[in-house]
Every structure is written in C-alpha cells, then in structure tokens.
From Swiss-Prot:
Membrane topology: Multi-pass membrane protein
Annotated transmembrane regions: 5-25, 44-64, 73-93, 96-116, 135-155, 158-178, 192-212, 220-240, 260-280, 299-319, 327-347, 357-377, 391-411, 469-489
Protein family: Belongs to the major facilitator superfamily. TCR/Tet family.
PANTHER family associated with the record: MAJOR FACILITATOR SUPERFAMILY MULTIDRUG TRANSPORTER MFSC (PTHR42718), METHYL VIOLOGEN RESISTANCE PROTEIN SMVA (PTHR42718:SF47)
Record has DNA damage as a keyword: no
Function: Major efflux pump for acriflavine and other quaternary ammonium compounds (QACs). Also required for resistance to methyl viologen.
SUPFAM superfamilies found in the cross-reference section: MFS general substrate transporter (SSF103473)
Coiled-coil portions: none
Protein name according to UniProt: Methyl viologen resistance protein SmvA
Domain of life: Bacteria
GO MF term set: transmembrane transporter activity
Organism: Salmonella typhimurium (strain LT2 / SGSC1412 / ATCC 700720)
Alphabetical list of Pfam families matching this protein: MFS_1 (PF07690)
Length: 495
C-alpha cells in the first residue's frame, strides 16, 4: 500500500510542472516582449505552440508507453522536459524559445499518458484508483489555473527564465524517485505508434493557424496565404481519410458521428478557448495599460482561477439535477454575458465589478467543461471509453492553443485598426507601433520621452478599445454557440 501511494506522489510531482507550463507564460507575455524583443506574432507562437504540439503528440506517446512500459516513458518524458526547460530558461531569441517550447510539449505529451497508465497499473481496486485519478485531475486543473499566479510571483523576484528553471529540480527529484521506487512494466511490442499520423495532424493544425494569423496581419501575399491554407486543409482531410481507412487509427473518427460526443468535444474546446484566451488578454492589459506587475496581475485574475477550481463539485450536482443540456448551454450563455460585462468594465476603477464578472466567467466556463466530460464519457460505448477520453484530452489541448490564437488575432486586428499615432513618425515606425501593444512599448522606449509618451498613450487607448472588441466578439460567438448547442443536444436526446 505504501508503494502505491508513493507512486502516486511521484506521478503528481512530475505532472505539476506540465500543468503549470500550459498557462505560466500568460503573465510573462509583456516581459518576454520587452526582454526578447518578440513581435506580437512571435509572442502568440511562444505561448500557444505548447498546447498545439501536445494536442497532436499525446495519443502516439500513449501508444509508445504501451510498447515500452509507463516507467520508461515517464523517465524519457521527464528527462526531455527537464532539458527543454533548461534550454528555454536561457533563450536569447524568440525563435529559440519557440523551439524549446516544442520540445517541452513533446516531453509533456510523454508524461501525461505515462502518469495515467501508472495510476491504472498501480491501483487495482476501483475505489483507490478513482481516488488517485481525482488527485491527478485536481493537480492538473489546479496547476493550470494557478500557473499565471506562480509565474507572476517568480517574475516579481527573479529572472524571467525562472518560470522554466523551477521545473529542473522537480524533474531531477522525480527521476531519482522513479528509478528507485516505481516498478517496471512489460511493454506490448505489437502496439502501433501512429507517429506519422501525429506529425500529419500537427503540421495541418500549425499551417491552418499560421495562415489565419498571417491573413489577419497582412504580412504575406494572398497567394502564399492561400497556398498555406490549402495545404493545411488538404493535410487535415488526408489525416481524416487515413483514420477512417486504417483498422487501428490514432483517433476513432467514427465517434464523431455521435451527436452528443461531437457536442461534448465542441464544448470542451470552447471552454478552454474561453478560459485560456481571456487569461492571456487580461495579463497583457493589466500590465501594459494599468501598470501592474506580473505578480499583481496574477493576483487580480485570482477570481477566475478560484471559481473555475470550485465549480467542479457544484457543476456535477447541477448536471445530475438539471441535466446536461441545461448546464452545458447555460454555462456558455453565462460565459457570453460575462464577456459582455467585462467588455464594458474599467479595470482601474471598477475592480469589484471586474472580479465578480471574472468569477462568473470562471465558474460558467469550467461548468461547461465538466458538462463536456460528462457528455463524452456517458455517450461513448464501454469498449471505446479510452478512445473517447483521448479525444477529450486532445480537445482540451487544442482548445488551449486555439484560445491564444483566436483571442490574439481578435486583439491584434482591432488594435491595428484603432490606434491613432502622433504625427512625425516614419512609415516603419508606424507599422511597428500598429502591430501590437508590446511592439508599441518597445518603440516608445527607444524614442525621446515626449514622443514616446504620446505613442504609449495612443497604444493604451487602442488596447482598451481592442479589449472591448475582442471580448464582445467572443461573447457573441459563445452566445450563438450556446443556441446551436441547445438545439443540437435536444435532437440528440430525442433519438
């Protein structure tokens, strides 16, 4: 019994930095922009590449664990995660940091299925296994929720690379404990890896996201954007066709023909897009516009984190009493109303109103997330429960990556359209200041004080307006989705 719970402690320890790294850079965005000279586009890639790559790699890494055993996979993933953290901490350019974040994502994609497989292999009794899974889930949601606060504390007192360096001692301790105490398991050599399918999916996702970002930025010619978009769409279509044709697919695409499962996947992605995208937007506004430190920004956003953490048990009861359809659509509708309210809130003078709306957003979005889990797990056939769970995991990670991309694009587009810069700037300076808030601040710091202050004032006014546009747009999309989900789930329940 002692060895079982020691294994759980080891699993939880290694999972903590994986969960935190998904959100820890949200409050670090302004710091990275200034320190590395990252453009707005580079900043989005630094943050969202982690979730996008992890979404495509988590399933084949799970298959690799079946082949070599979860202990070896945990050792391999932990080692890669630790080395990538060390490399990321001493990045001197945005491109290098993006590359190390890719390696971090691959390491994390090994760790997540290894920890779940470890729990299944270690806890034979259902009661103990469910308890262990509950601890694992709490650590995952808690780590992601408090990532911005932890990042803020570290940035307040240490070098920005400390948000990555903190992973290294944790990994070293876990690797030592794993080697000494975790038993080795026999692998199944016949398990297919589907690495080619995973690479195809990741490239398709990255090409589609890249084409969307560059189209709205207007940095490339129309034919280059069209070619990138078409290539991504063709690769995605080829991936789907391959999954349907093979006898042992990476993703069981036939599960998407079930209306409730499809609705659950959409809800999971939407909830993650909402929470992650909002955190990134808020972190930038609080620091760039209102002058808060990273730590103060993390504290200001606590209502979202706390409310989302406490929503689980309450939302579970609500699903049982009110039904999946009402909780799911109600959660999205309340999230939309929260966005509308926050779009009209002045964060410098209406803090209590902002905190109340953020708490409502955290609770409602997390409730929709729990409803999505209930929908997927309840609708999936027993023999396909693992495949359904894998799809849900991918939806979470993909939603996190898309949340950063979507909110970043909305913010960037409205910022560029609304900024009114002072006269006397060269064309290159105008293009740079109009690109993003971070680049406007970089330019202002390089110019004489009077001219720099005029640019800062213009950028802050534009960012506040852009914040309202982005939140209102997101609220409208959520409201339309809630209406669509209401009718979709009604049709599914009548079948």
């Amino acid at each position: 019994m002692f060895r079982q719970w020691l294994t759980l402690v080891i699993i939880v320890l290694v999972y903590i930095p994986v969960a935190i790294d998904a959100t820890v850079l949200h409050v670090a965005a302004p710091t990275l922009s200034m320190t590395l000279g990252a453009s707005g586009n580079e900043l989005l890639w630094i943050i969202d590449i982690y979730s996008l790559v992890m979404a495509g790699m988590v399933l084949p890494m799970g298959a690799l664990g079946d082949r070599i055993g979860f202990k070896r996979l945990l050792m391999l993933g932990g080692t890669l995660f630790g080395l990538a953290s060390l490399a990321a901490a001493f990045s001197h350019t945005a491109s290098w940091l993006i590359a190390t974040r890719v390696l971090l994502a691959i390491g994390a994609a090994m760790i997540v299925p290894a920890t779940l497989a470890g729990i299944r292999a270690t806890f034979c009794e259902e009661k103990h296994r469910n308890m262990a899974l509950g601890v694992w889930a709490a650590v995952g949601s808690g780590g992601a929720a408090f990532g911005p606060l932890i990042g803020g504390i570290l940035l307040e007192h240490f070098y920005w690379g400390s948000v990555f360096l903190i992973n290294v001692p944790i990994v070293l301790v876990v690797m030592g404990l794993t080697a000494r105490y975790v038993p080795r398991q026999a692998g199944r050599r016949d398990q297919p890896l589907n690495l080619g399918h995973a690479v195809m999916l990741i490239i398709a996702i990255l090409l589609l996201v890249y084409s969307a970002k560059t189209a709205l930025k207007g940095h490339l010619s129309l034919w280059v954007i069209s070619f990138t978009l078409l290539t991504g769409a063709l690769l995605l279509g080829l991936f789907i066709r391959t999954q349907l044709a093979t006898s042992r697919p990476m993703i069981d695409m036939r599960l998407f023909t079930h209306r409730i499962i499809l609705s659950g996947v959409v809800m999971a992605m939407t909830a993650m897009i909402t929470l992650v995208g909002f955190e990134l937007l808020m972190a930038q506004e609080l620091q760039f516009v209102h002058g808060l430190s990273p730590y103060e920004a993390g504290v200001f956003m606590l209502p979202v984190m706390v409310a989302s953490g406490f929503s689980g048990p309450i939302a579970g009861v609500l699903v049982s009493r009110l039904g999946l359809r009402l909780v799911a659509t109600g959660g999205m509708a309340l999230s939309a109303l929260s966005f509308y309210g926050l779009a009209m809130t002045d964060f410098s003078t209406q803090q209590w109103q902002a905190w109340g709306l953020m708490a409502l957003l955290g609770f409602s979005a997390a409730s929709a997330l729990l409803a999505s889990t209930s929908a997927i797990m309840a609708a999936a056939p027993a023999e396909k429960a693992a495949a359904a769970g894998a799809i849900e995991t991918m939806a979470y990670e993909l939603g996190a990556g898309l949340g950063i991309a979507i909110f970043g694009l909305l913010l960037s587009r409205s910022f560029s359209a609304s900024i009114r810069l002072p006269a006397g700037l060269e064309a290159q300076e105008i293009a740079r200041a109009s690109s993003s808030m971070g680049e406007a601040v970089q330019l202002a710091n390089s110019l004489p004080p009077t001219q720099g202050q005029a640019i800062l004032d213009a950028a802050r006014h534009a960012f506040i307006w852009s914040h309202s546009v982005a939140l209102s747009s997101a609220g409208s999309m959520l409201l339309l989705l809630a209406v669509g989900m209401w009718f979709s789930l009604a049709k599914a329940q009548r079948r």
